[in-house]
Amino acid sequence: MDATFTAEQEEIRRTLRELLLKRCGPEEVRTAVQSEGGYDSALWETLAQQLGLPGLAFPEAYGGVGCSVTELALASEELGRSLAPSPLLATAVLSVPLLLAIGSEDQRAALLPRIASGELTAALAVPGASLTIALGLTGDNRGDWAGGGRAGGVQARRTDDGWRLYGQADQVLDGHSAGLLFVAAHTGGFARSRTLLFLLRSGSPGVTRVRLTSLDETRSQARVQLRDVEAELLGEEGESSDVAGVLASVGDSAAAVLAAEAVGAADRVLERTVEYVKQREQFGRAIGSFQAVKHRLADLYVQVQAARSAAYYAAWATAAGEERVGGLALAQALEALRITSSEAVQLHGGIGFTWEHEAHLYFKRAAGDELLFGPVHRLREHAADAARLFGGGEVAV
């Protein structure tokens, strides 16, 4: 593994950081999350058309940039620093890999160029509130998470002219605004029946989307209800796809990207805290000069840097097709962000507890992502089970 960034990777980081410093400060973030889409559409257009972010990690033949998960992780690290609300996670990290892995050539040719241009955003809808299980991050994703029929969840029924979907999906990231939904559904009325993926276009009759109130407002979520909805199968009819295996692979790469994003957030909130303790005075001196405060900040720095190393390695391993360590990296990064943001609130004193200050936004990102993709101990437990560290049986990953 070469840990040195290429000139192209450094340019991605530098350009994004400069842009976000100008256009995505705390006030811009608050304004964006209150908008109908939950993000700044003008900023998203710039990220797509000038920087090529949505298509960063897919082939140039479909309008992408042709980079890898590593570059996507570096870009997400910069977005995490500013907590920039955007459809990048739902579209480029969770949805595009499914289209590349399972979609037919016609589907890829029709949809990927529109995604690359920023014209089309996408979201992954899995039944109930089981995103972390569906992605294989905290357990075996070949179980009954998708429900189906009397088991609940989302059911797909074959008809003479195609497929029909029934059911409900929660925790759908950017599901209220996405122009394209990737829906996981069971094809039978029992818990372990076959799972397939389907495409739903914007405006499909029978689809109800409700934006949910979430702990982390920068990570928009929606509930998607399906009532006799006509759907298009992802991939070719008659082909057998290992949907659970593909979802687990996507989950690992998504975890690596999310880990980098969390590291970016932790790094930024630590920077802001260091700046503040150099200015705030008690007993006639800056509180940052007290040894107890220095030690707390030093511990945070070590934790953030360790998480960064884990995130970078996970991104590299994913891009190189090596071992799956995204879940472990995500656990370390989420823990680092939670501890760092919590300490930031404390070290800022009274102002750190106010709504106007940005510290609570970082704490909510940590807590919200643990609810969506964790918790940390479950991520580590599953990684240990998969590696059979404690003599357990074989676990599918």
Task: Show where each model-derived region lies.
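Flexible, small-/acidic-enriched active-site or ligand-binding loops
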Residues: 136-142, 171-172, 201-236
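A structural signal for short hydrophobic beta-strand segments in well-ordered beta-sheet cores
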Residues: 154-156
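N-terminal glycine-rich flavin-associated loop
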Residues: 86-106
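A short, Trp-centered hydrophobic/proline-enriched beta-strand micro-motif
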Residues: 118-137
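Short secondary-structure capping/junction motifs at helix and strand boundaries
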Residues: 86, 105-112, 121-123
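Alpha-helical interface subdomain recognition
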Residues: 1-80, 102-105, 114, 118, ...
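A generic structural signal for well-ordered coil/turn residues at beta-strand boundaries
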Residues: 120, 150-152, 177-179, 193-194, ...
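A short core secondary-structure module
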Residues: 125, 168-207
